[in-house]
């Protein structure tokens, strides 16, 4: 799926921001965006982190997708101007550069956003996830709807393994994992906490 936009399902970013602010200043954060697509979601995550934690946060985002083409687009961070028209003026100025001349009508995310992100290819269904350290937060939004029940369960078990106890999992608006209460506790609309 490549349907994506900046700050889609905005309540997630409000909850994420409050979660980031809940720890002492300077505490390190490790976050995984497991369906990076063309980059709007990972950049929204990093913008939220910069707003919540200040300009040089101890923050690292791993952004993955199965599709290397969309990852290349994400890593470039270049978008049509109309794709950010829903953002506040403050966010547009703080996080984007406007194209000039032949690049008029385009915007590019500022380099400090990209510096906080590692883009890598990961197939959620395969068991060879490359992660060494567990994450504080995982975004796995609007992917599971494409998997059957047993596959969803396997992926959730793996996410449980790579998420710290008490870590947060954000899922898509159409996704419900109430049958996985042994792994996750519902903490808000489509927000779960790892048991």
Give the label of every model feature segment.
Residues 27-44, 59-62:
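Conserved class I S-adenosyl-L-methionine
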Residues 137, 177-195:
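Core SAM-dependent methyltransferase catalytic element
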Residues 34, 57-139, 143-153, 176-178:
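Extended basic-aromatic, gly/pro-enriched interface segments that bind polyanionic ligands
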Residues 1-32, 172:
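Conserved AdoMet
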Residues 153-165:
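A short glycine-rich, Lys/Arg-flanked "PGG" loop and its adjoining helix->strand segment in the class I
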Residues 17-20, 43-50, 160:
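A structural alpha-helix within SAM-dependent methyltransferase catalytic domains
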Residues 51-57:
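Short helix-capping segments at alpha-helix termini
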Residues 165-173:
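Conserved beta-strand signature within the Rossmann-like core of class I S-adenosyl-L-methionine
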């Amino acid at each position: 799926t490549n349907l994506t936009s900046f700050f889609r399902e905005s309540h997630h970013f409000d909850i994420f921001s409050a979660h980031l602010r809940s720890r002492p200043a300077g505490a390190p954060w490790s976050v995984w965006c497991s369906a990076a697509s063309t980059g709007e979601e990972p950049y929204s995550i990093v913008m939220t982190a910069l707003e919540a934690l200040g300009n040089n946060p101890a923050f690292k985002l791993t952004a993955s997708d199965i599709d290397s083409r969309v990852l290349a687009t994400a890593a470039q961070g270049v978008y049509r101007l109309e794709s950010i028209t829903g953002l506040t003026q403050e966010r547009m100025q703080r996080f984007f550069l406007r194209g000039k001349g032949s690049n008029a009508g385009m915007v590019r995310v500022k380099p400090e956003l990209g510096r906080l992100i590692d883009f890598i290819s990961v197939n959620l269904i395969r068991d060879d996830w490359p992660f060494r350290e567990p994450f504080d937060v995982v975004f796995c939004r609007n992917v599971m709807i494409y998997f059957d029940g047993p596959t969803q369960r396997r992926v959730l078990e793996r996410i449980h393994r790579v998420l710290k106890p008490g870590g947060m999992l954000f899922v898509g608006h159409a996704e419900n994992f109430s049958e996985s209460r042994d792994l996750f506790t519902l903490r808000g609309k489509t927000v779960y906490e790892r048991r």
